[in-house]
A protein has these predicted regions:
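Structural marker for long, regular alpha helices in very large eukaryotic proteins
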Residues: 1-200
C-alpha cells in the first residue's frame, strides 16, 4: 500500500469546508472550538480529514504571525494541540504519516501558480511563510510525540492487542519522518546557500 500523498484522493468540498471552519476559529468561543472541530472531522471522516485540518490550521497560524496581521496565531496552535486528545492513537499516527507525506512532496520555493494548485496552502503565502510552515509542522510533531499527555495518557491506555496492530503504523511513521527529515536538511540548505542567507 502506498503512503504518498495525493490531493485527488479527497474531494474538494472537504478542503473548502475545513478551510471555512479554520477561518472561523477566532470567532468561535474557546470552550466550543474543540467540540466543533472534532464534530467536523468526524462528519468528514477522520481518516480523510484530520491531517487536512491540522495542516490548514498550521497555514492560518503561520500567516497570522506576519507583522501586519492582527490575528493572534495562538488561536490556531492551541486548537491543533487540544485536538490531539480527541482522537485515537491510530488516527493520530495515520494523520501524522499523511502530514509528513504531504510536506515531503511540496516544494520550498513555490510560484503563484504552484500555490493556486495546492488545496491547503494560502495563495498569498510568501517564500518565508512556506519555510516557516515546514518548520512549524516539525515543531508541532515534536510537541505531539514528546507530550506527557500523549505518552503517559493516550499511549499508556492502549491494550496489548491495539499495540500489536499499531506496530506497522509506527514503522510507517518513522519511515515518513526520516524521509521528511532528509527533505528538511537537503532542500532548504541548498536553497539558502544560493541566496547566501542563513536558514532561519
Amino acid at each position: 500500500m502506498s503512503h504518498s500523498y495525493h490531493h485527488e484522493e479527497t474531494p474538494d468540498s472537504i478542503y473548502k469546508i475545513i478551510d471555512t471552519f479554520s477561518n472561523a476559529t477566532p470567532h468561535v468561543p474557546v470552550h466550543r472550538r474543540e467540540t466543533v472541530f472534532q464534530s467536523l472531522m468526524v462528519t468528514c471522516g477522520v481518516t480523510e480529514s484530520l491531517h487536512i485540518g491540522w495542516l490548514t490550521l498550521a497555514v492560518k497560524h503561520v500567516v497570522a504571525q506576519r507583522g501586519d496581521n492582527i490575528q493572534d496565531p495562538t488561536d490556531y496552535f492551541d486548537l491543533m494541540t487540544s485536538l490531539i486528545g480527541r482522537f485515537s492513537v491510530r488516527e493520530i499516527i495515520d494523520s501524522s504519516v499523511k502530514m509528513a507525506s504531504y510536506l515531503s512532496e511540496i516544494k520550498f520555493k513555490m510560484t503563484p501558480d504552484d500555490l493556486k494548485k495546492d488545496k491547503i496552502l494560502d495563495t498569498n503565502m510568501t517564500q518565508d511563510d512556506i519555510i516557516n510552515f515546514h518548520y512549524f509542522i516539525n515543531f508541532f510533531m515534536y510537541r505531539l510525540y514528546s507530550s506527557h499527555d500523549f505518552i503517559h495518557g493516550q499511549l499508556a491506555r492502549i491494550t496489548e492487542e491495539e499495540e500489536l496492530n499499531l506496530n506497522e503504523a509506527y514503522g510507517t511513521l518513522l519511515n515518513k519522518l526520516l524521509q521528511y527529515t532528509e527533505v528538511i536538511f537537503k532542500i532548504p540548505l541548498s536553497y539558502w546557500s544560493r541566496q547566501n542567507e542563513p536558514y532561519f
